[in-house]
Amino acid sequence: MSKVKNLLAKMLQRFGKNSSQADSQRYDSLEEIAQNQANERMLRATQVGLEEHLVICLETEAGSFYWHSQ
């Protein structure tokens, strides 16, 4: 449940950011790239049957978010 709360907090932060801050946008872009790569690795592992966990995908305007049960 804490993962879901953290995910929602991140999404709310993205929606509430001021678009005039170039440094934070750059940081967000790097963070988003890293998150997308982690999401893709997890999704690939799930698709090839390496993990037998529930995978949930939440698609928003801020991006797609994946997490799985452990």
From Swiss-Prot:
Keywords: Developmental protein, Differentiation, Neurogenesis. One of its GO terms (biological process) is cell fate specification. GO terms for molecular function: ubiquitin protein ligase binding. This is Enhancer of split m6 protein. It comes from Drosophila melanogaster. The gene is E(spl)m6-BFM.
